[in-house]
Regions:
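Juxtamembrane helix-loop-helix connectors linking adjacent transmembrane helices
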Residues: 2-100
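Transmembrane helix-loop-helix hairpins at the membrane interface
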Residues: 60-180
Length: 180
């Protein structure tokens, strides 16, 4: 980032850092999947029920965007926020959240759902992929109440993202929903 004249603490620096980290992780998964003789279809990178997938994902994204200020203040220690203050950050925030959502949905759902479902069934697969996803977010310092975040917010959302992937046979909607 210094070569680009960006500070890691700037919105652009944070976004580019997140993007390159997620891109590296995604590329590793795709390459190893290919070396294992699997197609991207096995990772739920496919059309599936695209209309339903995109509808649910985009509705969630619009609703959460409309509620971003109160949610950020309530759960993520946001202070003195206004649309005028956050608008300049939105392009960089979109890069960060879409990169992160694509990476996490690929790793936690794309890699495991298709391989676990034949043995565990849909519901158990949903629960088994949700537990490590939620635990992976433990220990962060960006929210004000860990119990509320994990039990009342992240756990049901993770179950919903997995359900959406299973229902639509695709990651696209869960990526957008997760980004929301």
């Amino acid at each position: 980032l210094p070569a680009l004249g960006l500070s890691i603490k700037s919105p652009a620096g944070l976004a580019i850092d997140k993007f390159e980290s997620c891109l590296l992780g995604i590329m590793i998964v795709l390459i190893l999947n290919r070396l294992a003789g699997q197609s991207v279809d096995s990772l739920y990178i496919r059309r599936g029920r695209l209309g339903l997938s995109l509808t649910v994902g985009l509705v969630a994204l619009v609703v959460m965007t409309a509620a971003v200020i109160p949610i950020t203040e309530l759960f993520f220690k946001g202070k003195d926020l206004s649309w005028a203050r956050i608008l300049p950050w939105i392009p960089w925030a979109l890069v960060m959240i879409l990169s992160n959502a694509a990476y996490e949905e690929l790793v936690f759902r794309g890699l495991f759902i298709g391989k676990m479902e034949p043995f565990l069934g849909k519901f158990a697969t949903n629960v088994v992929t949700t537990i490590p996803f939620v635990l992976n977010h433990a220990g962060n310092n960006y929210m004000s109440d860990a119990f509320i975040f994990f039990v009342l917010q992240l756990l049901p959302l993770s179950l919903a993202w997995c359900w959406l992937t299973q229902k639509t046979n695709s990651l696209w909607g869960s990526i957008l929903f997760h980004a929301a």
